[in-house]
Design a protein with these regions (language model features):
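Transmembrane alpha-helices
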Residues: 273-307, 337
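Generic hydrophobic transmembrane alpha-helix motif, especially the helices
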Residues: 187, 197, 201-244, 254
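Short cytoplasmic-facing helical segments at TM-TM junctions of multi-pass membrane proteins
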Residues: 246, 250-289
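N-terminal signal-anchor/first transmembrane alpha helix
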Residues: 30-69
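Transmembrane-helix boundary motif in ABC transporter permease subunits
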Residues: 170-200
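Periplasmic/extracellular loop-to-transmembrane helix junction in inner-membrane transport proteins
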Residues: 30, 65-172
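Alpha-helical membrane-interface segments at transmembrane helix boundaries
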Residues: 158-170, 193, 200-203, 286, ...
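C-terminal transmembrane helix and the adjacent membrane-cytosol boundary/short C-terminal tail
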Residues: 336-368
Length: 368
């Protein structure tokens, strides 16, 4: 009995050690906060943020004044002094109808951000109310074999963010499934590398718009009598085809440049072809493969906006285009909010990939 208790305690200690090691890998070590680190890691970044916001505010104010002067001068030229005076008074009063529509200030962008969050909360409340009202009816419809009644209201800004994330992850997964196996096969053979190099070099620089049109033609034909979401399918396939090339090239290069000593060790151990790939070649190629995957994810996120805009998928691309078309006084500030959200999410996705790379790869210098 005492022996079994000791074994359980040992297992708990081993599990705790594994979890602790995982957390240490996932979270970077905290720096020692001496004066030099405090200045370099905190004060200088904060100063750069303050400087950026200050320059932005000054630039927005200057553009506002230029646009306001233009509107006043135009009123003077077209309608006379009285109209110009009225325009000047209207602009000074802050009335929405006559405000210059130019680069928004940081304060306006922050206000629009809060407006979008409040709008999301209101839409979420409407969804919850709709779900509660239709719950009984949907249970009855499902029992009768009918499709449930779903909420068809407009998506909120936060909903569109999650739609874009779903699309980019589906596209990234497609790129991974295609690029890594094909890259391994091409990398194992000099003949295949020479045979497929021209194909890669031709398709790698193709514009996302062209890929979208090609995918659109194929998907529309194949989903004519289907209830599937063709906009989502078109978007994620286009994203995957646009972004897979960096992973394909890096995987082939990583496989082709595996140290010959590792290959010789595999021969000595008499590993079969499959064992050699999974136990020697792929582990040795991981640094280059993950570099390609990081580039693929970044490219996927960049091309997503243009693809969603054209495919009419209800994501961030659609949000930006609708606000641009809307032309309301706060449309520009909402577009700037979307720009910051896109940039921050792109940065976080890259950090996640870098963290995963450091956990599964022996290359500890990949910290760019």
């Amino acid at each position: 009995m005492k022996h079994s208790v000791t074994v359980v305690q040992d297992e708990k200690e081993n599990f705790g050690t594994v979890v602790k090691g995982f957390v240490i890998k996932l979270m970077p070590a905290m720096p020692k906060w001496n004066g030099k680190n405090l200045v370099r890691k905190v004060l200088i970044p904060l100063a750069s943020i303050v400087l950026f916001i200050g320059l932005w505010h000054v630039g927005a104010k200057a553009l506002y004044n230029i646009e306001a002067d233009y509107k006043i001068q135009k009123a003077l030229t077209d309608q006379g002094q009285e109209a110009a005076d009225q325009m000047a008074e209207c602009i000074a009063s802050g009335a929405i109808s006559c405000q210059p529509n130019t680069l928004p200030s940081p304060a306006q962008v922050w206000t629009s951000f809060n407006t979008l969050i409040a709008d999301h909360k209101a839409i979420s409340a409407d969804k919850a109310e709709f779900k509660a009202k239709t719950a009984t009816l949907n249970v009855k419809r499902e029992a009768e074999g009918k499709a449930p009644i779903t909420y068809t209201g407009r998506p909120s800004f936060v909903d569109q963010i999650f739609t874009s994330l779903k699309t980019v992850f589906a596209g990234f997964l497609l790129a991974l499934i295609i690029a890594v196996p094909v890259g391994v096969i091409i990398g194992l053979s000099t003949t295949l590398r020479s045979s497929f190099n021209w194909l890669i070099q031709i398709f790698k620089p193709v514009s996302p718009v062209v890929w979208l049109l090609l995918v659109f033609m194929i998907v529309k034909t194949m989903t004519k009598n289907s209830d599937s979401d063709s906009a989502f399918i078109i978007s994620f396939i286009s994203v995957g085809l646009c972004s897979m090339w960096a992973t394909l090239v890096n995987t082939a290069m990583g496989v082709a440049t595996v140290d010959k000593d590792y290959i010789n060790v595999a021969k000595v151990l008499k590993l079969g072809p499959i064992q050699k790939v999974f136990k020697v070649i792929l582990p040795s190629s991981l640094p280059l493969i993950f570099t390609g995957l990081r580039i693929t994810l970044s490219v996927a996120w960049m091309v997503l906006i243009a693809i969603e805009l054209l495919a009419q998928s209800p994501g961030l691309g659609s949000f930006v285009w609708e606000e641009f078309q809307n032309g309301a006084i706060d449309s520009n500030s909402k577009i700037i909010v979307a720009m910051f959200v896109i940039g921050i999410i792109g940065f976080l996705l890259d950090r996640i990939m870098l963290t995963v790379q450091s956990m599964v790869s022996f290359n500890k210098n990949a910290t760019a």
